[in-house]
């Protein structure tokens, strides 16, 4: 923070580090930093913080050592939201069981990029975990890096069967992914690329009562 207006000097001081809650939800609008304001967000070196950000308490003091940790809060919250938005049902019961299926099978399609890996680390380390996670991508280098960051043998210690699959090398990706699932299909599928072929594959590998999130 470089300069603080008189109305906020009791809480903020020049030199303080901060991060933002960008989902303002101000009076029902979709306004957000980087898209909706001329002098706020994006690649600006200096910003003027709009009054609504202060009104909503969305300017947050940051006391961490690494800036990247603060910058990951928003994208990770999006992936966490996707896990929480998933739901499943039981026959004859008209209620939704929110969240991914505990002990189920999870596929993260086109998932070896930054957002997919964020979803993977959350799936591996949260309280409610699947029994199987399959991460697909077309880029072998990214898959190899993902496997080095999240070794399947480490996941196995927590009872999770972890697979990294290059669908670009498969003649029939859907058939192979279904085979990996044991023929049941997947309880939860997260699609991390806005590519028609990936979306189609995501739908095709769903199991009974499966939940598909078009994340990208």
Describe the function of each predicted region.
Residues 188, 204-216:
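ADP-ribose/adenylate-binding Rossmann-like module
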Residues 78, 114-115, 142:
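Hydrophobic/small residue at the entry helix of a nucleotide-binding pocket
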Residues 1-24, 40-41, 60:
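Glycine-rich beta-strand-centered segment in the early N-terminal region that forms part
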